[in-house]
Amino acid sequence: MTPAHKSDRLNLPFMQEAALLAARIGLASLFLFSGCQKLMHLQGAAEWAASQGVPFASLLMPLAGLFEVASGVMLITGWHARQAAAALAVWIIVLGPLFHRFWDAPPQLWQISVDDLFHHFVMFGGMIYVVVFGPGSWRLGRPKS
């Protein structure tokens, strides 16, 4: 009798689903935090956005905060996760370069601006992964089998 293969002793489907959930939580955490910060500090967020050239910042920042929180919750719960990830991917790819303009940054802030922009591109890659492969089976709204 041959010994069981190591993967036979592991519950791979469980581990894969746990990993997908952990990835969704990780991806969503940035947006939950950012959205909550905008909503809790609306005046400061609007002033900062206005200083970056955002028109109607006082109106747009609460909407941005709500969008980020709602999308983050959808991503974590897996409820319409592909749609939330697609919306966040567009959000990232459009707003990342607008707010992290390393080419305009003073020398002492250049590296931070570059790093922030590339962090956004990494998040974009994660969102595309969710769009293409889905949230996994641990999600709300999953059809009953």
Predicted region positions:
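Membrane-interface interhelical connector segments
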Residues: 40-56
